[in-house]
A protein has these predicted regions:
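N-terminally biased helix-coil "hinge/interface" segments that flank
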Residues: 1-188
């Protein structure tokens, strides 16, 4: 079935009927149910994820394009970079900046964020990834962007890099949060 949970429930119901009990009776007999699925990885591989936008610090819109700078064949210029997980057309620059010590360099421009939110509405995005520079040192700007998204785009899931993957290296946080956000509409 299209809903993967329904498939699991149907299989459990069938198993229960083979034992001449109902589903609640079967579930009561067990201590734990572990279910694994390839649903998320299949969606990524086939490109059937949600239409996702990326919000990042102004001046750094190409983080998913440039990655960490390496190429599989650094001297073969015929080998193209892979396409970014979120297209550049759905990447938005947020005027703000924290430094590596968590000190605010540029205040968060909330009016600009609200303007971006209006653009997100017009583009009918289904999920939003947020990865601001140095949010791992001070998450206040990223958290505030999350608050604004929740208020002005209710029902649209979003992921914040400082919560999902609070680690050094912007690309790793950006790619993790992009994947997480893109799967939320499918997995909930």
């Amino acid at each position: 079935p299209e809903d993967p949970v329904l498939g699991v429930l149907n299989a459990l119901t069938l198993a229960a009927s083979k034992r001449n009990i109902d589903l609640p009776g079967l579930m009561a007999k067990g201590d734990m149910l572990i279910h694994g699925t390839t649903y998320a990885i299949n969606a990524i591989i086939t490109g059937n994820t949600a239409k996702t936008a990326l919000l990042t610090t102004a001046g750094h819109p190409d983080i998913l394009v440039l990655r960490e700078g390496g190429r599989v064949e650094p001297f073969n210029f015929l080998v193209p970079y892979p396409k970014p997980y979120i297209p550049r057309a759905l990447t938005f620059e947020v005027p703000e900046r924290m430094d590596s010590h968590g000190q605010q360099v540029i205040p968060l421009d909330e009016e600009a964020v609200l303007s971006i939110i209006e653009k997100l509405k017009s583009k009918n995005v289904e999920a939003i990834a947020v990865c601001l520079l140095w949010s791992i040192a001070n998450s206040s700007h990223e958290d505030r962007v999350g608050d604004l998204l929740a208020k002005h785009l209710p029902g649209v899931p979003y992921s914040l890099s400082n919560i999902l993957n609070p680690a050094l290296r912007e690309y790793r946080r950006a790619s993790a949060v992009a994947i997480d956000a893109s799967l939320k509409p499918l997995m909930t």
